[in-house]
């Protein structure tokens, strides 16, 4: 049976989620606690401690020293003559813990069950009965002779043996633990204990420093009696027990029976150990309930709360923090200085520089240690109360435990913990006192008006200090449920008077009067003297812990989880309104719905990203610890929801990776085409399939150079990342004004790296890549070719193309036009001037000038029609190597996109001209690009309204809005009339300029061909008819001239590669016809010439029009 039990325990240790450090990100640690968090909460241990070994055991305490004999025979039986407690023994890295309460390692364990103990005091909180002993305080471990397989371990501690002075008749603390389990389980536990004991020996010096600061050590070591005798030179001064040693403790020591309490605690310490080696028995809880002696109060607070264990790790942390940040200033220090003189002014110690200085140093040190919280309201009151009974270092560590574990969220920027407990308190009042709750609601009395200061100041500001400290005594032992029990008891006792109040003022007055009479008798008219001796405060404690004993930690936890979301939403809603209200003037360009959507999405992405990063970091740390030792596999869990606004200080800046996720949730072009490996690995490796539902549904973000430029553009400080203000300003510039010129300028500025208003060759190519990246997922109907454009050239195959294919052609045209209208840089201009001067000098040379003049394109035609010379095959090039190099260099130089020696750039006016010259690009910047950022539904509906630029008259919509299709309208002259067609816009203007240049070049070429052929006829002495020669020359010259003109123009504009030029099928037929003419005989040529000459003579203007049509067809291809 024992083997089966150990097997089940081992299986549970492997199944436990804490082994994998996977917190439930959708819930808090109270709702689904890990084994490690339960263990630390149960024994009040630092966050670095994890459960390594556990076993069922029985604690055997020695008999009382007063009843035991000093004889050797009886001393042998001391280990078996005292109280016996059955429970569970736990081992961590630096502590050995024993508890009689239900263990946190049960399969059905929760944080509430692990902190509940139904003993004589009706719930003693997380500490329970048992001990929490540092391993460094164990002096010796012996295995006793026992029956059969039982392992009996005798532990001897350093209790009372670390000081220089020891009390006469000192007896070391010794107790026995019997392990209950299989032999293998017991040996495994003993092996782990032995290993950790050796590692903890180096911390004995830290234990010595901590113990010497405890008043119990001074009290029981005999140093107090020596100090009272003035003749003893070796007497050491008592340790610092707070400002009360200098300015007296609150209350009358005689009425409080301080001496009697001190004697009771001294006796308990002698029998059960003290400070770090204290064993908790039921008497321990009773002594705390009746009140603590003044000089031992600070030490007992440390032991009960667990801050002593925290101070043991680094005893000099407080002094080191003050020395490290000495002389530095911060915003928290400024707030601290304002509240110093308002901290318990009724106590004399805080009216002097001594008390003010102590308070300043503790608050300042904590603000540097916990920079996220820094300093918050009411923290000065709590610390001032602690300093009355504790030293500065003790108050510093207790404040840390108070803020982080006992009342988390009470002292933060949002005070979400206090507000949450107000909801819990109201729900408990409604449940336990429904009549009073209904009356307060009918009278419109806010319960939080009086209860909020109770919880925030831990009743220090509400009750007289003497009674407030009695509440704190039980609070540090049993936890925050004491605050609710005392509050409910106050309302129950004053219920009859509270039913008569009608407003907040009278409500506060009744309770204030009650607090001022807490020292009076609760039954002044009673004839029973014992009953008459009971004070109102004693009555309050009895009602709190008896009538409201059903208020347990489980009750508080359930109510907190019930109201947590609503409270956080209220806090975050208030923070949202405040943040939006404080945004800059750029936010006025966006609607309130859009601003709200940006805020929600910004913090949702940031919160989710911070959570994943936290878990990934913890996973990495766990893997590192796993490599070094198996016992450290169980890592600390993520107890706090990182990044949520309502929980206090949270990250306010997002880095580039978080910005990618924000864009992916805002614009569909920012979504990756396929999930990246890093995201897959993060989802499967770090979370092991237990990630958040929202994170799993969120698409994977893309990573493009455009998104990086957008991040740098929006960020005011790239090192810190993007703030909410930066994101709002960036989106407002795009979606706010709805101005196409603004959008074009914004896009241009993204690629203006130097800020000089110029975009170079690489920038043009990256612009085109960005356009393709932004348009790869469609346009959602924001880009539609106009009907007039579709009817401009009916019957074209391009009309059957989709919008995406049309946009692809527009981007291609964008690249060509950018390089065509790009300006050369300064160095290029100087080189061109030098080359032009050289060409002018060379133009006066005599030789082959005539051949150069007509070498525009005829060589290609002649080389195809003229037979090759002997010794050359048709495939052999006829050009010399130098001529080929010259041709290649000329071709590259003619294409701006291929010539790296001639850097080019475009300016903003050129970029605007090229964009506005294309209808799809114009719609892209006017509609799609700003509307691609989807924010809110109302914002999307408003985006469908006509923009500012749509009401303007541009080249693309000129006459479109006002043009009415009527049958009887004035005849509009076409291009021949010198009027640009309305729907052609700026493209028509640019294309007509190019067409006129081509037509002029064709005419010049034609006349040069005629002059050349005339010279050839004179040289050959031909007797042909002049009219036939003219017709023949007209036929052979016109077509090649146009073809040559187009070829030379295309090479200059688009490059020398013929595949890059857009040539219509009719032009290709014309080229084939020219080849046939050159091959055929002379007679056939004359017949064709007669036909062509006849057609030319019949319509003198048709040839020019035909040539114009061919050229215009070339320009139409230029648009696509």
From Swiss-Prot:
Biased composition range(s): Acidic residues: 1023-1032
Amino acid composition bias (Polar residues), ranges on this chain: 960-970
Superkingdom of source: Eukaryota
Region (Disordered): 673-702, 859-903, 960-979, 1017-1068, 1081-1120
Lineage of the organism: Eukaryota, Fungi, Dikarya, Ascomycota, Pezizomycotina
Record PANTHER family: RAB GTPASE-ACTIVATING PROTEIN 1-LIKE, TBC1 DOMAIN FAMILY MEMBER 2B
Low complexity bias: start-end ranges: 864-878
SMART domains: TBC
SUPFAM superfamilies: EF-hand (SSF47473), Ypt/Rab-GAP domain of gyp1p (SSF47923)
Gene3D superfamilies: EF-hand (1.10.238.10), putative rabgap domain of human tbc1 domain family member 14 like domains (1.10.8.270), Ypt/Rab-GAP domain of gyp1p, domain 3 (1.10.472.80)
Protein name: Putative GTPase-activating protein AN11010
Basic and acidic residues bias: start-end ranges: 1057-1068, 1081-1095
Organism (species): Emericella nidulans (strain FGSC A4 / ATCC 38163 / CBS 112.46 / NRRL 194 / M139)
Residue ranges occupied by any Rab-GAP TBC domain in the UniProt entry: 291-479
GO MF term set: GTPase activator activity
